[in-house]
């Protein structure tokens, strides 16, 4: 091509109805559903699938989303059956099982654990099958407003090419990159909670017995909590989420530090006696709890981690991203047909998402505190409080009045217990807020800033 042809190619602007930034669960969901509604959708993922991602444990409330999306059987085929979540307890077994089939809401009685690289790839390919133009190795570099709602996007490929897109709407599902929130200076560090994680994958770890074999197991230690997540092919995801102070003191290699950390919980370490760390590979990441001060504006909307990220303890990330993407598609669809209703719908959705995150946050912020630990280690189902917690663990936090009433009652009981030991609770809160002011910068994953 001659120079004139090159210039013409650069100046050409490709037209579409919607651009979706990011090829994770939220982005793939949005792209698939918008394409199904007849819109011309371009989905842009800067990497290539399959690519590694943490967050392997799904919630029961994911299942209705999978069914509406048309991928439930694909998830079932690739996942490990998850009947519940196990937490340490002062009983003969050493743990309590919060079985999902005891939930009081309408949540399904089980979930799945998946390899995220396979799960994310399947969802992205499904978006393509639904009609989205799903591109990989294409990174959005800049977005500028081209009208009241339209946007112009500058895109670069990993082959060294560049082009422009004009979109009537942009869905930002860029994950922790938080493309729009970062560039529009909307991103806010969470002043109440920060943590960091270190983890690896083991082969040969001991699972629970019987129906509990596929459960996620949660353990506590002095600086945070640990997980064990059974994955396909006999692999166990094992890691620790800790206050930044703990990870910042690491002087040994990531492998040595992980093993030293896991040994602090004998019940977990015992399950790893016959296990082998796969490829001796250990990853470290900061969780960087944050949110955006606004979910969207004229012609753009944030989905999933591009809007907010809390903490992985209750495995809520994939569900909040995909369910949020479903609702975001409704906003985009209505806004493209009737722009006058856009901001009203967006404010309603933002209020809904923030309310669910606030309900999760109540448990997350206090999870390592003495009162919450006592309530999880010695659960009592008076007034169906334990079943209300199970519904929360299942992700049923939006539209079930009975569940929300039980969670409000749980908070009241928590307050009573806290008053009994208010000095200790105050010390824990003071420590948590001090940790939230720290910044951990030792991450080794692509999600962590260099």
Please give the residue ranges for each predicted region:
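Glycine-rich FAD pyrophosphate-binding loop
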Residues: 19, 35-54
């Amino acid at each position: 091509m001659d120079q004139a042809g090159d210039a013409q190619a650069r100046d050409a602007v490709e037209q579409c109805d919607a651009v979706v930034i990011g090829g994770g669960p939220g982005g793939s969901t949005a792209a698939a559903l918008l394409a199904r509604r007849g819109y011309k959708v371009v989905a842009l993922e800067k990497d290539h699938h399959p690519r590694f991602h943490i967050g392997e444990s799904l919630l029961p409330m994911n299942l209705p989303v999978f069914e509406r999306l048309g991928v439930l059987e694909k998830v079932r085929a690739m996942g490990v059956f998850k009947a519940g979540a196990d937490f340490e307890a002062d009983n003969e077994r050493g743990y309590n099982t919060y079985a999902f089939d005891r939930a009081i809401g309408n949540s399904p009685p089980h979930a799945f654990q998946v390899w995220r690289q396979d799960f994310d790839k399947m969802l992205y390919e499904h978006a393509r099958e639904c009609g989205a133009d799903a591109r990989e190795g294409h990174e959005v570099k800049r977005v500028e407003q081209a009208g009241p709602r339209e946007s112009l996007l500058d895109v670069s490929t990993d082959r060294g090419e560049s082009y422009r897109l004009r979109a009537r709407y942009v869905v930002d599902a860029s994950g922790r990159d938080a493309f729009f929130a970062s560039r529009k200076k909307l991103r806010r560090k969470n002043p109440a909670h920060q943590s960091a994680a270190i983890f690896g994958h083991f082969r040969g770890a001991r699972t629970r017995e019987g129906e509990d074999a596929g459960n996620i197991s949660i353990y506590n230690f002095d600086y945070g909590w640990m997980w064990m997540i059974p994955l396909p092919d006999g692999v166990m995801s094992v890691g620790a989420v800790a206050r930044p102070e703990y990870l910042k003191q690491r002087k040994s290699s990531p492998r040595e530090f992980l093993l030293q950390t896991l040994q602090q919980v004998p019940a977990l370490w015992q399950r790893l006696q016959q296990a082998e760390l796969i490829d001796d590979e250990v990853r470290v990441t900061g969780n960087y709890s944050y949110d955006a001060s606004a979910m969207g504006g004229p012609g753009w909307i944030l989905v999933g981690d591009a809007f907010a990220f809390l903490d992985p303890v209750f495995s809520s990330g994939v569900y909040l991203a995909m369910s949020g993407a479903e609702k975001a598609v409704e906003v985009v669809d209505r806004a493209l047909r009737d722009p006058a209703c856009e901001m009203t719908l967006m404010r309603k959705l933002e209020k809904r998402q923030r309310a669910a995150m606030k309900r999760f946050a109540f448990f997350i912020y206090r999870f390592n505190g003495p009162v919450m630990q006592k309530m999880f280690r010695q659960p009592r189902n008076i007034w169906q409080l334990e079943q209300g917690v199970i519904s929360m663990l299942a992700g049923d936090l939006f539209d079930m009045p009975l569940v929300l009433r039980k969670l409000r009652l749980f908070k009241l009981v928590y307050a009573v217990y806290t008053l009994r030991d208010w000095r200790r609770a105050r010390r824990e809160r003071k420590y948590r807020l001090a940790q939230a002011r720290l910044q951990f910068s030792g991450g080794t994953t692509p999600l962590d800033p260099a």
